[in-house]
Amino acid sequence: MDLILLLKAVILGVVEGLTEFLPISSTGHLILVGDLLDFNDDRGKAFEVIIQFGAILAVCWEFREKLIKVTSSFASSPNARRFVLNLFIASIPAMGLGFLFGKHIKAVLFSPIPVASAFIVGTLIIFWAERRQQNLVDVSSYIKSVDDLRPLDALKVGLAQCAALIPGTSRSGATIIGGMLFGLPRAVATEFSFFLAIPVIGGATAYELLKLWKAPVAFSGEFTLAIVVGFIAAFISAFVCVRWLIHYVAHHNFIPFAWYRIAFGILVLFTSYTGLIAWSH
């Protein structure tokens, strides 16, 4: 049994779970940590796709009561149908752009320097969103929960989500901060971001799994075990992170994450420029 491989799987699983739903970019962290662990070959890329599904399952489990209620009452409840419609509307822009330009973005921007730059730019947007929210006397008073969102609100969040196609931007950051910039309360923007992850990330993961099925990567027995371990680590850490973030946003803002992003971005730029870390991308 390769214990080093299993340790790498746990580390990457925890990184995926902790960063997928925080405004700090899971993709950016996985690229950088994957470089450091020398875990960025074809098997490593397949591994990242599969463990991402574990993080999505954590969201489904946390909000299982809401999802069951929407599913069971879809035919009879206008609120349930509007909720599903909002998710559909918010999913289309990023999924469409990803389908059209995803390969080009991966070819050009999936490397440490663009990722670090996106981290720093994202910091400035977080500061802007938090300052703007503080200056709003009445932050969309008609919106108290995700059930109050209108299709137009969903479209605005969906357009903001397009920025997440740039690695290092953060899908959750784009949707949460974008929602706040468009006037949504912080807690509502965060919860809607969780739900939006299910069709968007779930769909993207399913697409990547389909590509793996058509062009399979050979896995050894040990690597298959590493995938299982990473999947479980991603599920558990994502579940803990989602539950914590729900409570956090009720009383705090995202400024600490902004400082983290700028510090992390500067660190990456410095180590890349000086050669202290031999980034492989």
UniProtKB/Swiss-Prot annotation:
GO terms for cellular component: plasma membrane. The chain crosses the membrane at residues 4-24, 46-63, 83-103, 108-128, 187-207, 222-242, 257-277. InterPro entries: UppP. One of its GO terms (molecular function) is undecaprenyl-diphosphatase activity. Its main location: membrane. Its EC number is 3.6.1.27. It holds the Pfam family BacA. Keywords: Antibiotic resistance, Cell inner membrane, Cell membrane, Cell shape, Cell wall biogenesis/degradation, Hydrolase, Membrane, Peptidoglycan synthesis, Transmembrane, Transmembrane helix. Disulfide bonds: none annotated. It catalyses: di-trans,octa-cis-undecaprenyl diphosphate + H2O = di-trans,octa-cis-undecaprenyl phosphate + phosphate + H(+). It is a multi-pass membrane protein. It is an enzyme of class 3 (hydrolase). One of its GO terms (biological process) is response to antibiotic. It is found in: Cell inner membrane. Belongs to the UppP family. Bacitracin is thought to be involved in the inhibition of peptidoglycan synthesis by sequestering undecaprenyl diphosphate, thereby reducing the pool of lipid carrier available. PANTHER family: UNDECAPRENYL-DIPHOSPHATASE. Catalyzes the dephosphorylation of undecaprenyl diphosphate (UPP). Confers resistance to bacitracin. HAMAP family: Undec_diphosphatase. This is Undecaprenyl-diphosphatase.
